[in-house]
Amino acid sequence: LYPIGENGGSQKLLIQAAKKGRIRVEMSRRICQDCGKESPNLICHNRNSEGEVVECGGKTIERKSRGSNSRRRRGERTTVDLDKLLEVKRRLLGLDRLPEFIKAQKELLSEAQTPEPIEKGILRGKFGVSVFRDGTSRYDMIDVPVTHFKPKEVHTSWKKLYELGYEKDVFGKELENDEQILELFPQDIIPSLNAEEHLIATCNFVDDLLVRFYKMEPFYNVKTVHDIVGSLAIGLAPHTSGGVLCRIIGWTAASAGYAHPLFHAAKRRNCDGDEDSILMLMDGLLNFSKHILP
């Protein structure tokens, strides 16, 4: 979620815009509390000298606009040395080269017009992850209500389900095989296997973001969809602003998302076959921001 104006072509590609060197775009005007220089970012990107890779890293505060107070958006026309900025970010992230396909925006639609850290876009491009306008990566599925299931139907072993709290079947017998019928917990979900590629890529992106940008340990360590079982996610209807916490317990071959009627109703008041989305919880915690919403 970084503005490049008309410089990125019809696909709004960051690398294509960077070939022009300097670009002029509308972004927030902020002042670093450490070095006193202007930076459009929440964390100052300025360097002491051109040859250095280390950035200031100080927190910035919004500067009073020089324009009219009647404008809905508070950004101002700013010159960005995009090619130099991307090269510095590449070196800071420890990448050999930048991904070719990094999508950007023509303009920022939020009130303050504060951009996301450009590093997030670079790492999304590395894993081919799309981004919604709130900073998260979502996968849409049709809602299908389900109340009971068998372990073999959700591609999860009964032993794994036992670890997740499914200790007894509907008849009160101890869970000990894949043929027993279990009652679905209200906040457990069974997404479509069609989401496999997207969710694995999102988990890998989040781990890379934690390691390269936040300098922390990876969280998901995912290689297959079975590694995602037990992970927390957020269910969200497109017309509401409140997500509902859920847990992934298995997968379905259907092109739909199976979940308890109470879960679907919590998202949108009913469960009559509408389409909602899920996003990984850590993605939401790291990347969602009300400040970048239109």
What do these predicted regions represent?
Residues 1-294:
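Conserved core architecture of multi-subunit DNA-directed RNA polymerases
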